[in-house]
From Swiss-Prot:
This is 5-dehydro-2-deoxygluconokinase. It is an enzyme of class 2 (transferase). PROSITE patterns: PFKB_KINASES_2. One of its GO terms (molecular function) is ATP binding. The lineage of its organism: Bacteria, Bacillati, Bacillota, Bacilli, Bacillales. It comes from Bacillus thuringiensis subsp. konkukian (strain 97-27). Pathway: Polyol metabolism; myo-inositol degradation into acetyl-CoA; acetyl-CoA from myo-inositol: step 5/7.
Length: 332
C-alpha cells in the first residue's frame, strides 16, 4: 500500500531545497588523490542530484537554493535549466561566498572518498526571506536535505519551508544526508535532524544516519523497527532505512515492512547511490506505485549510477531504468 496522498492540479510535482555545489570527480581511478591529475566537473549536492534525477524521470521540478556570483554559480543554474528544473527561486549570493567543491577519489569500487570544501559557501546563506510560501504551495511534494540544516540562515530557511509545506498539504520527503564536516557537534546535529524529521512524511537514511539521530537517546542497540516506530508518532508515514549492499527496508505506519534488494552491476564508485535511489523511489511513489515497486525503481537507478563516472549526469530516464531491470540480475 502507498499511504501518500498528493494534491492534484499543482504545477510542480517536486521542489527541492538546499545544497548546490560542484563535484570534481577523478578521471584517473585505481590511485589516491595525491596522484590524480585531472578531474571532470559536474553539478553536485544531494538535493540537486535528487532533483535532477526526478526531472529526468519526468517530474515537474523546482529548486530553492542559493548560488555564488561567479562562473561556478552560473554553471549550476545553467545545468539545472538545461535539465528542465525551474530556477526562479535560486537567488545569487552578494556577499562574496563561493560554491562548495567536492573532490572525489576512486581508488577502487570499494574504496572511494570525498574531499569537501565547505567554508563560506553560498548555499548555506539562503535566507528565510528568500523562501516563498506561494512557490511551495504550488508543489505536490517538498524535498529537504540534512546538510542545509548545518548553519544559519539556511537552517531557518529550511524550517520555514517545512512550515509552509505543512500549512499547504505538501508532502515532505527528508533525505538525511549527514555530512559530519559541516557540523560543530554530534548533539547539535541530532537536535536539528530530529526537529526536521518530526515534520516529515517520508524519512530516508542509512542505518548509520539514523544511529546519529538517536545519539541523544542512549539506545543500547539500534533496531530498525524501533527506529521507524519512533517517527510514526509524529508525521512520518514511511521510513526507509538503507543498508548499503544489503538493500533497504521501508516501514509504514500500519505496521508493514518491505525489503528492497539491489541489482547486480559493474561498480565504478559508491557515491551517488543514495541520491539516485531517492529520486527514483520518490518518482515511483508520486506515480502511485506500491512501496515495493518504488523501491525496485530506486534500487535499479542506484545500480545504474554507481556504474558510471558522474552522479548528476548519470541519473537515468524511465526508459533506461526499465531496460536495465529487464536484463540485470536482482539480488534480494
Amino acid at each position: 500500500m502507498n499511504p501518500l496522498i498528493f494534491k492534484g492540479n499543482r504545477p510542480f510535482d517536486l521542489i527541492a531545497v538546499g545544497r548546490l555545489c560542484v563535484d570534481l570527480n577523478a578521471n584517473e581511478t585505481q590511485r589516491p588523490m595525491e596522484e590524480t591529475r585531472t578531474f571532470t566537473k559536474y553539478v553536485g549536492g544531494s538535493p540537486a542530484n535528487i532533483a535532477i534525477g526526478a526531472a529526468r524521470l519526468g517530474l515537474q521540478t523546482g529548486f530553492i537554493g542559493k548560488v555564488s556570483d561567479d562562473q561556478m554559480g552560473r554553471f549550476i543554474t545553467g545545468y539545472l535549466k538545461d535539465n528542465k528544473i525551474n530556477t526562479d527561486q535560486i537567488p545569487i549570493d552578494c556577499t562574496g561566498a563561493v560554491t562548495g567543491l567536492a573532490f572525489t577519489e576512486i581508488k577502487s569500487p570499494e574504496d572511494c572518498s570525498i574531499l569537501m570544501y565547505r567554508d563560506n559557501v553560498a548555499d548555506l546563506n539562503l535566507d528565510p526571506t528568500e523562501v516563498s510560501e506561494d512557490y511551495i504551495k504550488q508543489s505536490k511534494a517538498l524535498l529537504i536535505s540534512g546538510t542545509a540544516l548545518a548553519k544559519s540562515p539556511s537552517r531557518e530557511a529550511v524550517f520555514l519551508a517545512l512550515e509552509y509545506a505543512r500549512k499547504h498539504d505538501v508532502v515532505v520527503f527528508f533525505d538525511v544526508d549527514y555530512r559530519p564536516y559541516t557540523w560543530q557537534s554530534e548533539a547539535e546535529t541530532a537536535v536539528y535532524y530530529n526537529l526536521a524529521a518530526e515534520k516529515s512524511d517520508v524519512i530516508i537514511g542509512t542505518r548509520e544516519e539514523f544511529d546519529m539521530m538517536e545519539k541523544l537517546l542512549n539506545y543500547e542497540k539500534s533496531n530498525d523497527q524501533v527506529t521507524a516506530e519512533r517517527w510514526f508518532s509524529h508525521h512520518a508515514k514511511i521510513v526507509v532505512i538503507k543498508h548499503g549492499g544489503d538493500g533497504s527496508i521501508a516501514y509504514t505506519r500500519d505496521g508493514q515492512s518491505h525489503r528492497g534488494g539491489i541489482f547486480k552491476t559493474k561498480v565504478l564508485k559508491t557515491f551517488g547511490a543514495g541520491d539516485s535511489y531517492a529520486s527514483a523511489f520518490i518518482y515511483g511513489l508520486m506515480q502511485g506505485l506500491e512501496i515495493p515497486q518504488a523501491m525496485r525503481l530506486g534500487g535499479a537507478s542506484a545500480s545504474i549510477v554507481i556504474s558510471k563516472h558522474s552522479c548528476s549526469d548519470a541519473m537515468p530516464t524511465r526508459a533506461e531504468i526499465s531496460a536495465f531491470m529487464e536484463t540485470a540480475e536482482e539480488l534480494v
